[in-house]
C-alpha cells in the first residue's frame, strides 16, 4: 500500500513527506448497486473508502448508491462523470444496462467492474464463479444470520462472499490505475484483466477463523441472545 501512495504522490508532483494541495482532487467514484442491503452483500463501501484514503492522500471518494435501480445507476454514472471522476468502480445493477456505461464518451474514464463482470470494463474484481442466491429463506441472507443458524444447527453450512476483501482490492486497482502503475496478479476473464476471489463454504468449525477472522461478523454478534449458550457449549466464548 505504501508503494501505491508513493507512486501516486510522484505522479502528482509532490512528496510523501511534504505533501501537496491540489485545486481539483483526484476523484474515485464507487457506483454501488445497493450499498445498504445486508441480505447478499456485494460491496463494502466503508472498507473501499478507507482503503483509498489509506493509499491515496490526494483522492476523494464519492459513493453513489443506486438502491437496486438500473435507471438510477445510469443517472449516477452521468453525475460522476460530470463531477470529474478520474476512475469509476462499478457494481452493476444490471449487466446489460451497465455495458452502456463502459467506454462511453470522448474522454474515456477507466472502469473497474466489481462483483459482476461487465463486458468492456478495464478491470474486474469478483468471484471465480457466480454466487447462487441462498434459498434458506430471507432471514438467512446475511452473513450474520446465516452464521447464527450454523451455530444453532439450523443449517449445516453457509456460503461466504468476501465482500470486504473484494472491495479493498477494487480500491487498490483504482489507485494503481490512477498512478499509472502496473497492476500485477490479474488473470484473463473474457478479455478483461480480473482478480477472482473464492466463495467459501463455512461450517461450524470455520466460523471464528473465517467470518470473525476476516471481520465479516464479530464474536459478540455471533454469540449474543439466542446463540449465547450454544457458543459457550462449543467453546466459542
Task: Tell me what each language-model feature is.
Residues 124-136, 142-147, 162-182:
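Hydrophobic alpha-helical segments within soluble ligand-binding/sensing domains
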Residues 65, 88-92, 108-118, 139-141:
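Short beta-strand elements of ligand-binding domains
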Residues 169-237:
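Hinge/cleft segment of the Venus flytrap/periplasmic-binding protein
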Residues 21-23:
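Bacterial signal peptide processing site
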Residues 95-132, 147-152:
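Flexible loop/hinge segments that line or gate small-molecule binding clefts
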Amino acid at each position: 500500500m505504501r508503494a501505491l501512495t508513493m507512486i501516486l504522490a510522484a505522479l502528482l508532483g509532490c512528496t510523501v513527506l511534504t505533501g501537496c494541495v491540489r485545486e481539483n482532487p483526484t476523484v474515485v467514484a464507487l457506483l454501488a448497486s445497493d450499498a445498504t442491503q445486508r441480505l447478499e452483500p456485494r460491496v463494502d463501501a466503508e472498507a473501499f473508502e478507507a482503503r483509498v484514503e489509506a493509499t491515496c492522500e490526494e483522492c476523494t471518494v464519492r459513493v453513489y448508491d443506486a438502491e437496486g435501480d438500473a435507471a438510477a445507476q445510469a443517472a449516477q454514472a452521468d453525475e460522476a462523470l460530470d463531477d470529474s471522476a478520474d476512475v469509476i468502480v462499478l457494481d452493476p445493477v444490471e449487466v446489460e444496462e451497465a455495458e452502456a456505461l463502459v467506454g462511453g464518451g470522448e474522454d474515456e474514464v477507466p472502469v473497474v467492474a466489481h462483483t459482476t463482470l461487465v463486458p468492456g470494463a478495464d478491470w474486474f474484481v469478483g468471484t471465480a464463479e457466480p454466487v447462487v442466491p441462498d434459498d434458506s429463506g430471507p432471514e438467512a441472507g446475511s452473513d450474520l444470520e446465516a452464521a447464527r443458524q450454523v451455530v444453532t444447527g439450523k443449517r449445516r453450512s453457509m456460503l461466504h462472499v468476501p465482500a470486504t476483501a473484494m472491495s479493498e482490492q477494487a480500491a487498490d486497482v483504482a489507485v494503481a490505475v490512477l498512478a499509472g502503475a502496473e497492476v500485477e496478479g490479474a488473470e484473463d476473464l473474457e478479455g478483461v484483466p480480473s482478480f477472482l476471489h473464492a466463495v467459501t463454504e463455512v461450517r461450524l468449525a470455520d466460523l471464528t477463523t473465517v467470518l470473525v477472522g476476516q471481520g465479516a461478523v464479530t464474536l459478540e454478534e455471533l454469540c449474543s441472545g439466542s446463540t449465547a449458550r450454544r457458543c459457550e457449549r462449543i467453546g466459542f466464548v
